[in-house]
């Protein structure tokens, strides 16, 4: 494990890769060299980056399984993104977090809907009561004799049929 962080070991691996690539290039039918070189570079970089991180994580963490799972998922997601895919892997914990978040939002929306329907029902009941109070009821006569002084006013029967309502009467006032 100490070889992983050693500079000579790293240079030896790079030299081995270069020799391998030069041997492959000598063959006349090799046209995929840039793709092979890119893939080997990515794999080597991931190898150099992930092993020391995993070594450190195994020493310091008690839950090494979760760390390894998280590192593997991250590496696979990196490879998928480098390959041009928009899909990605999620571990079970992340999926459960997303499900819990969605369920929480649904519960909040349901409580809001319940509150709104309760308010709407109360408003409809209030409008019904207001309508009932405003409806004119024709079943009972309102006695207006106490409201105005009926002695000072002539009724239609008092005017009689021979007199026109538009006829003026002479008013004489003292000067």
Curated annotation (Swiss-Prot):
Give the sugar-modified residues: 8, 18
Q: Which UniProt keywords apply?
A: Activation of host autophagy by virus, Calcium, Enterotoxin, Glycoprotein, Host endoplasmic reticulum, Host membrane, Host-virus interaction, Ion channel, Ion transport, Membrane, Metal-binding, Secreted, Signal-anchor, Toxin, Transmembrane, Transmembrane helix, Transport, Viral ion channel, Virulence
**One GO term of the biological process aspect:** monoatomic ion transmembrane transport
Q: How does it sit in the membrane?
A: Single-pass type III membrane protein
Subcellular location field? Host rough endoplasmic reticulum membrane; Host membrane, Host caveola; Secreted
Ranges annotated as spanning the membrane: 29-51
Q: Which residues lie on this side of the membrane: Cytoplasmic?
A: 52-175
Q: In its UniProt entry, what is this protein called? A: Non-structural glycoprotein 4
Q: Which organism encodes this protein? A: Rotavirus A (isolate RVA/Mouse/Brazil/EHP/1981/G16P[20])
């Amino acid at each position: 494990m100490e070889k992983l962080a050693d500079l000579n070991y790293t240079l030896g691996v790079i030299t081995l890769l270069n020799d391998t690539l030069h041997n492959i290039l000598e063959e006349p039918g090799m046209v995929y060299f840039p793709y092979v070189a890119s893939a080997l570079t990515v794999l080597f970089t991931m190898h150099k980056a992930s092993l020391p991180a995993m070594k450190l994580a195994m020493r310091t963490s008690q839950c090494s399984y979760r760390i390894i799972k998280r590192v593997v998922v991250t590496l696979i997601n990196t490879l998928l993104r480098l390959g041009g895919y928009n899909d990605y892997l999620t571990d079970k914990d992340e999926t459960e977090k997303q499900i819990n978040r969605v369920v929480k939002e649904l519960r909040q929306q349901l409580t809001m809907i319940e509150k709104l329907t309760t308010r709407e029902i109360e408003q409809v009941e209030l409008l019904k009561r207001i309508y009932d109070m405003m409806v004119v009821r024709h079943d009972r006569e309102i006695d207006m004799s106490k409201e105005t002084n009926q002695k000072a006013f002539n009724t239609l029967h008092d005017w009689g049929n021979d007199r026109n309502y538009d006829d003026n009467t002479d008013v004489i006032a003292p000067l």
